[in-house]
Regions:
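Surface-exposed cleft-lining segments at the edges of enzyme active sites
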Residues: 1-5
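Carbohydrate-binding surfaces of carbohydrate-active enzymes
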Residues: 6-7, 11-14, 22-26, 34, ...
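Distinct, well-ordered alpha-helical segments
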Residues: 33-44
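Switch I (G2) and immediately adjacent beta-strands of P-loop GTPase domains
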Residues: 18
């Protein structure tokens, strides 16, 4: 079942990549999470960038180094963290609890320190209603910054200061 399921996903990813490659020169990738269900090499074979999503609790950041090291080497292409949480994580409730001060800062630097070229957050602004109300963001529904917004801004300034070194 697992091999069948993996082939199904790879087939779908390849089908979508073929269509997108016809209409854009932008890099094409697919968001992945670290599970044992996929062949990451097969999934990324026709893609231009390796993308990874992670929503682990702050206590698991050390384990994320392994995931970054593994996925970054799947293909000799850019490695992007395309979804991670700015604060808490949740859909209808805040899963994994509160993030201690500094966790978002470390979560921003870690993938870059492990060879990542980009880190993106889910969500930029908190939802005013609907699904994922309990998901952290950079700004609340009124547009006010959370504590984690400053941590991300600090890392962004440091990325800018280290730009030449990080490009190597």
């Amino acid at each position: 079942w697992t091999r069948f399921h993996c082939r199904n996903i790879v087939s779908y990813v390849n089908e979508q990549a073929e269509v997108l490659h016809q209409y854009t020169k932008a890099p094409v990738g697919t968001d992945m999470m670290a599970t044992n269900l996929l062949s990451y090499e097969e999934t990324n074979r026709q893609l231009d960038v390796v993308q990874y999503n992670h929503y682990e609790p702050a206590a698991e950041l050390g384990r994320m180094s392994f995931a970054y090291d593994f996925l970054r080497t799947v293909k000799d292409k850019p490695f992007w963290v395309t979804e991670t949480q700015a604060g808490w994580n949740g859909s209808t409730f805040a899963e994994f609890g509160y993030r201690p001060a500094g966790a978002c800062y470390a979560n921003t630097w870690l993938p870059v320190a492990r060879g990542g070229e980009m880190v993106e957050y889910w969500h930029f602004r908190a939802h005013p209603n609907g699904h994922e109300l309990a998901h952290g963001a950079l700004f609340n529904t009124a547009g006010r910054a959370y504590r984690v917004t400053g941590e991300i801004a600090r890392a962004a300034k440091e990325f800018e200061a280290c730009r030449d070194l990080l490009r190597r």
